[in-house]
A protein has these predicted regions:
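Membrane-interface loops
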Residues: 41-123, 129
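Hydrophobic core of alpha-helical transmembrane segments in multi-pass integral membrane proteins
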Residues: 16-34, 118, 165
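Helical transmembrane-bundle signal
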Residues: 23-26, 59, 138-145
Length: 175
């Protein structure tokens, strides 16, 4: 397992908090602009909805607020097949094997894939590379979370799918 891996721990305990902080900073700059009646740093209503809005709706509301809280799926490291005491449950099956901070879906993966939102705002010349880097970071985070025994493939796949669909839908609607 990748539980004691430096990069895995950095992703798990540091980088993702900085990503969430960046969404908060974007919101704060936008709010300052609203209060001072000007656009600051090019952050208008559309930018704040795409970035801070999708961070709130995706990782916080959908993934952590609904699925992780109410789905009850035990983490791989906690199921009997891997030496734990909990029973395996399917990804879309509501279970009673976990009471808090459950496996389905992956919050870390959702936050990592959120980088797609600011990547879509990159200048056209660099957008392909920004999107590729965002998706690569999301996939790397997903692989590390699986390797740490924290999530099944389906947990990270559903998180990635929810975030990509949400962000692309909001982007297409606004831009």
């Amino acid at each position: 397992m990748l539980e004691d891996n430096f990069l895995g721990n950095l992703i798990r305990r540091g980088i993702l908090e900085l990503i969430v902080l960046s969404a908060a900073v974007i919101f704060a700059v936008w709010l300052y602009g609203k209060i001072s009646c000007r656009v600051c740093g090019g952050i208008d209503n559309r930018v704040v909805l795409l970035t801070s809005g999708t961070m709130l709706v995706g990782p916080f509301l959908i993934v952590n607020g609904i699925f992780k809280t109410f789905w009850g799926r035990a983490r791989p490291r906690d199921i009997d097949l891997f030496g734990g005491s909990k029973a395996f449950s399917l990804p879309l099956e509501i279970s009673n094997q976990c009471a808090w901070d459950c496996s389905f879906m992956s919050g870390h993966t959702a936050v990592a894939f959120w980088l797609l939102a600011p990547a879509l705002l990159a200048p056209k010349k660099f957008r392909f590379f920004a999107v590729a880097a965002a998706l690569l970071f999301g996939m790397t985070t997903a692989v590390f979370r699986i390797g740490q025994g924290a999530h099944f493939f389906s947990d990270v796949a559903f998180s990635a799918l929810v975030m990509c669909l949400l962000i692309v839908a909001v982007y297409r609607r606004l831009f």
